[in-house]
Amino acid sequence: MKKLPILLVALLLALPAAAGELEGVTLPDQVTVSGRDLVLNGLGLREATVLMVNVYVAGLYVEAKSSDPAAILNAEKAKQLVMRFVRSVGKEKLAEAWTEGFDKNAGDKRAALAGGLAKLNAAMTDVKKEDLITLTYLPDTGVTVSVKGKDAAVIPGDDFQRVLFSIWLGANPPNVSLREGLLGRAPKN
């Protein structure tokens, strides 16, 4: 009888880590960034608005789950957005999307953040199906932009991260279902 609890613990430790899945893309339920454990808050699908073409699956990682976009945006805590592309996208289209997202969400901070946006756009390269773009915010560093597994830029500033993450979590996301999924509100496929 005393061996049963030990056996149960051993079995639980042997189970694979849980993961989130959407549209055939699987992301881990937890990541560690600079010694900080982040949990998957939610997954969302970016659809091109005109033809409803799937572009990427995004996963939002935060220190503590929340369905409140303002709480996530205003928290000076580590967060990460991972985009796994489900189709090829050229660097010019990526830069256009970043610029449009800033235009829709930056408000009166747009001019002050132009340098950071230019740095973000310059970090882009053409991406293919299954490529990753990862945006990681650490309060003492800023946003690290990683494209295809390589760090491409570091952009300091809490204002920059707030506007950047508001592209997905703010009032004007590319598509509402993407924001709702990242906030853990949308049903997963």
What are these regions (language model features)?
Residues M1-L4:
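Positively charged n-region of N-terminal signal peptides that target proteins for export
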Residues S177-N189:
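Cysteine/selenocysteine-centered motifs that mediate thiol-based redox chemistry or coordinate metal-sulfur cofactors
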Residues A152-L178:
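Flexible glycine-rich active-site/ligand-binding loops centered on an Asp-His dyad
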Residues V147-G149:
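Short strand-turn-strand beta-turns centered on an Asx-Gly dipeptide
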Residues A19-L73, D108:
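N-terminal secretory signal peptides
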Residues G24-L27, Y137-T141:
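A short, compositionally biased
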